Amino acid sequence: MVRLGLAVILAAVGTVLVVGGLMNVAGPAPSDGPGASAPGSDVAAASPGSGVAAASPAATRGVEPATARAPTPSPSGDPVLLGAGDIARCDGTDDEATAALLEGLPGIVFTLGDNAYEDGSTAELRDCYGPSWGRFLDRTRFVVTGNHDLHTDDGAPEAAYFGDAAVRDGVTWFSEDVGAWHVIVLDGNCGLLGGRCGADSPQVRWLRDDLAASTARCTLAMWHQPRFSSGQHGNDRAVAPFWDALYAVGADLVLNGHDHDYERFAPQDPDGNADGARGITEMVVGTGGIGLEDFETSAANSIVRSSLAHGVIELTLQPSGWGFRFVSTDGSFSDQGHGTCH
């Protein structure tokens, strides 16, 4: 398949087509500082020289070339999360490039699964993940279990390597508060090791109880397989019970990997309908180092997509919202903006 080297972003001013080069599209005027947006929305803010476009939820298939700018620490001292999924293999170097980004950026590190290819073995964690992202184990607090991570002894090497960043109380789903946010790690390997994702499964029962007990205004959940995706794996209906539980309590943000690309969706309900009032924003960040893959389709409500750049997502967890910025390793692509919690 030929990889597309163009950008198509439907912005507030109309459809913009860019073939190569940089693009700047003036979006709606921010209402509350750079990158601010209306409550519940999630719109990338354009700024002079940034190459970052403001896009509407109706954006069509495309890639947005841009000039990445390294994020700066939050001046307010709000917690920062940094991460991606689909990270390390010994015959590649792109994971070392994304690790170099982590080295220059302060914050808590998370992974979105498929951390050490091909099989999550002890040797692969030591020899492939270790020299790159493994240098930041002391900063790594949230580790998602991907399907490749279960290939060896049902994930035992990963549990031993990451400890309670990956497994707590004997399971691969857990939560904790970070600043004003409730952060949840889930296991989306629904068909492996028995049913894990059904509405009456122990994991989803735990999730509903955990959400009911939380007093945080803002909620973020992360797991490996995306419910919605334009990528090679497409939509995963098996994780729909996660979305049902999260949407019912007004959760705000979901992070996934699995597809080897970057994609951001407008807020949606569990059925994939646009919902600017109560919808959840999903980001797929499978750009940690494994070879990138072309998109298979144009999923509804997908507003930014790139399969051309490895990188990490930086999230600034503010008391009533979040700032986000995708930082690529080669400076070829960036996506940034702000969302407001429900």
Predicted regions and their residues:
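N-terminal export and membrane-targeting signals
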Residues: 1-10
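C-terminal region of N-terminal signal peptides and the immediate post-cleavage residues
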Residues: 15-47, 53, 64, 89
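N-terminal low-complexity, Pro/Thr/Ser-rich intrinsically disordered segments
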Residues: 47-80
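N-terminal active-site segment of His-dependent metallophosphoesterases
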Residues: 68-128, 202, 209, 229-230
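Residue-level marker for buried hydrophobic side chains located in beta-strands
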Residues: 81-83, 109-111, 143-144, 221, ...
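Extended active-site neighborhood of metal-dependent phosphoesterases/phosphodiesterases
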Residues: 103, 117-218, 233-234, 238-248, ...
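Short, solvent-exposed aromatic-acidic interface loops
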Residues: 325-334
